[in-house]
Amino acid sequence: MAPKARLVAYKTNWNVQCPTFKTIGSNEIDVMAAFEAAIDDGVDVINYSQASNNSAYLDDGTGIATFHAMKNGILTIAGAGNSGPNAGTAANNYPWVLSVGASTIDRVFSAHGTRFYDFVSKVDVPSELYPLITGADARISGANVSDASLCQGGSIDVTKVTGKILVCRNAGRIVAKDETLASVVARDAGAVGMIFVYEEKIGDGFTLSQFHAVNTIVLSYKDGETLFSYINSTRTPTASISGVTNTLGVKPSPIMGSFSSRGPNQNNPGILKPDVTAPGVDILAACPPEIFQSSYCMKTGTSMATPHVAGIAALIKKVHPDWSTAAIKSAIMTTASPLDNDGMPIRDSNKTSDATPFAYGSGHVKPNMAMDPGLVYDMNQYDYLNFICAYPPESTTLKEFSQQHSYKCPRSFNILDFNYPSISIVNFTGNAIVTRKLKNVGPPGTYVPRIEPPPGVSIMVEPKTLVFSQKDQIIVFKLILTADINHLSTDYIFGSLVWSDAKHVVRSPIIVKAKNK
């Protein structure tokens, strides 16, 4: 994304964990130390490919550390997590952080129509036919059939597998190490390759791409059922693993990764999370060769999507060094697109249903458009402090987040007036007024609104047009939402607001949830 950027890495994960462990995969004190070191070093952007602990929120080291970074003009871009597709799993839900979901790119590595990953470049791809054997059929005497089906260590008979392609199932979960460990078992058993099949409950639209110790094909549940049907139809099943085919311009794309964590925001549903989605499936990454036996490997996860957006933020910072972290965040969010390369709504991981903003946030990032967004929803640390003030006990919380312990909270705080680039209205009673401020960061222009209201909701905007006569001018507008609450869906419903001057498109998703009757 930003090939001329200089990188510095700070270690947060250690083998020893403190009793006050609150952040997934590391000790929060180490996370805070890393952030403070980065702040002291004067970095411009922080990439945080790690999920925070949702239960802590404003009482954890990540929230405090990222807030300190924001105060020093440093935007943190963080992964939304890999706990999808379940609802309410999005992590790093702090409003001063840009959280990122993961979706596919328009490139597919395939072998005879199936997903293929050849990560160990030193191993020659076997092009001839080899016998196929399932883990269950290859189990060692006394081993559990289920363990052998998963190709778990100690369950496979080497004498049955040597010189064959081993077929393994996953454990009904999306865990990268399942693939890796199974491939190690296959290698140690003398297999020439492995076919790894995902279970039905994970869905048919996603397979992980991780390090494999042998040449591996990864199949979805549907393709796996076809394979098992073939194996059961003959006494001598055979297969070959062909060379990889790199296909570009794949449509439709992007498609959401099913692993990508989803909203609604469990900490505060009035803030939509994740904020955007970015490429995070089958991403070519540099890997430590002493671990992965190669300097490069294909990786999948929101940890891959996050640095894409961090690079975009670094480019914006270079072009607009005077912009606040909120302005950079707004530029990325309001120029993101909810459409795929067919001009249709981004699809969810099952490839048939449309994804929602709980999967992709404001949409898939558009780097070039983000450099010139036209308008931004700007904020400063005091806006975020007012947000924190809504969480009791305010005195203790404020002390953790700011050195300005004497900061006086406002008497009231209405999240509908919080100048966030996306708009979320929960506990909607049939009437609501949303206030936002837009700052002109482009040339003078007149912006007109285009509204797609959520089903059953009427929306009026005041004023009808926004006329900007100069740069940095700020104009306040209101959205007035009305609905017959008795005939409104009790589920979350979605719409959008677009301000445009015919050149710039400033888009905000709208999320409405009616109050329980």
Task: Please provide the spans of the model-predicted regions.
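Loop-rich non-cytosolic ectodomains and luminal regions
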Residues: 1-517
